[in-house]
Amino acid sequence: MSHSRKVSVTGLGYVGLPVAVAFARQGDVIGYDHDPQRVAQLRAGEDRTGEIELAELRQNTLRFTDRAADLRQGDFHIVTVPTPIDQANVPDLQPLLSAAATLGKHGLKRGDIVVFESTVYPGLTEEECVPAMEKESGLACGSDFAIGYSPERINPGDRTHRLDSVRKVIAASDAKTL
């Protein structure tokens, strides 16, 4: 039995936008960013990161939105928000935890898969992100939805080693999800 999943990508920066564009080559993708200005720029065919060409932004299978409720249309969610570090090299997890809570509240349904690509330390996905999604959705990881992790492999500005030419490492909560 085959299942065609609809992808949503949360965070349309230098990591998320290339990921959304790559998946849109294969099917419908919802590109979500909480910043209305960023979404308006992308809809106008402008990419401030310089990672994506105009023609790729205009794929008719890629839809940009700043409405969190639109995440509900997806069933395979990829979270690619930044985890900036401060002067002491401590990561600011607020963008990631906020994205996890938003996805839990507005997008997560039974049978969904969530893959995190944000740079995080070991254990963070299961210890922090999953509880945030469970709290907001009322669902349980493992029985209602599954998670995965695939560290970002994008080097901004590198035109040689693009997303489609670099091997990805992936992990998942169970063999079926993998």
What are these model-predicted stretches?
Residues 1-178:
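Structural/interface elements that position substrates and couple domains in central-metabolism enzymes
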